[in-house]
C-alpha cells in the first residue's frame, strides 16, 4: 500500500527547511538597501508641460530623485533589485540633476522610440499604468525630450 503522507522524519526535514527559509528571509530584511530620494538640484528646461507630464509618468521613477515605490518594493530581495535598477537609471539619465550645459539627448530619445523604455516589466500586472504610453504619446515624449535635453547635462549622452 502506498503512503500518501511523508514519513515523520521527512516532515521534520521539510519543516526545518521552511523554518530556515523564513528566518533567512527575516534576516535579509535587516540589510539597509533601499531607494533614497536626494534633493532635486535642477530639472532641465522643459520644452512643454506635456513633455514633463509624460516624462514624470514614464521615466521619473528610475530617472529622477523623485522615485515612488510600492510597499512590496521595499521588501528584500526585491528592494535590492529595484535600488540597483534606479541607481543605474539615474547614472544614465537623471532629470533631477541637470546642469546648464553638456549632455546629449540621443540615447534617451532612441530608447523611447525603439520601445525599450519604459521597460515592459515596469507595467506588468497593471502597475505604473500611467507609464503605458500609446504610440502617439511615445512619439510626443521622444520629440519633446529631444528638444528639452539638447544641451542639458542630465547624463546619458548620445
Regions found by a protein language model. Give the residues of each.
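The canonical Cys-X-X-Cys-His
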Residues: 55-67, 117, 141
